[in-house]
Amino acid sequence: PELIPADEAGNIKQKTEDLVGPYELHDFFIYHFLRHGFTPQRLFIMARHAFASPQQRAKHYSDDEIKHWLRVFLRRFFAQQFKRSCLPDGPKVGSVSLSPRGDWRMPSDATAKMWLDECDKL
């Protein structure tokens, strides 16, 4: 969406982050989901603590915001797996990689139902 031409005032018309959610939450979810195998409940609890206090340096997110973007993350993560199954090699940054030729093994027809059901119980 950032490739859509800017409006007359030079402002970006559409931002990906507005559609998929805050990148800092997605980064938090993907790291702990992949690196530690945390369940939605554990991800929610950890995010709640990490993004709870408005006095901290991280942006504050309410419980409802965290739940909403956790659902979006899980739905999109599982729905987009087929794209990762045919990707060329890419760089590995840190201790987590989504390269199908490296660390990550996941069927391209996996379903997010179990994970989304757990999100609904939060």
Where are these regions (language model features)?
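ATP/NTP-dependent adenylation/nucleotidyl-transfer catalytic domains that generate, transfer
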Residues: 1-122
